[in-house]
Amino acid sequence: YGINHKEIIASRGNVDYALGGPIPSVDPGYEDLTGLYPYNVDKAKELMKEAGYTTDKPLRLTLTYANTYGTELGDQLKSQLAKIGIDLKINYVEFSTWLQDVHANGNYELSLVDHAESHDFYKWTTPEYYYHYDNRNVQALYAKALAATDEKESDEYLKQAAKTVSEDAPADWLFGYRVTVA
């Protein structure tokens, strides 16, 4: 509730689209999940207060991401999250450092990276992957999707799995790239 995706997308020239979940719109199993956690500062502040944090007593977190992405997105997140009681420190690193510290060693609190790979939902079913997301229901739904012999049935299992991941909110999908061809 604390991240204004529309503002982020607008700052990028409105060429990208809101994603809302782990499956992009061009992949099997896609469902528009952007409505699960709409931007709502009051709701975000309420949840932060329930957790014991306010703008006067913020939760301190560090966001580690590769400096190849520039600083604007990190600055936007820092500004947006400050409004709900999160003091975000930005740790810009070389991509090679990100690969070692975050991806290989899992040494991070928050991270930001361009996950533009197609058909990569399986990563959400692999607790050893650097997300360390572990939900047996998601793993079972994904296994059913792979075993299904009917494409529509497989898509339904993928949709259920993706919705569960999104509801658990182990990540925030800031936006998807809109492919443009000239």
Describe these PLM feature segments:
Residues 17-50, 70-72:
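Structural transition elements
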Residues 1, 6, 10, 21, ...:
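Solvent-exposed, polar/charged alpha-helical surfaces in well-ordered, non-transmembrane soluble domains
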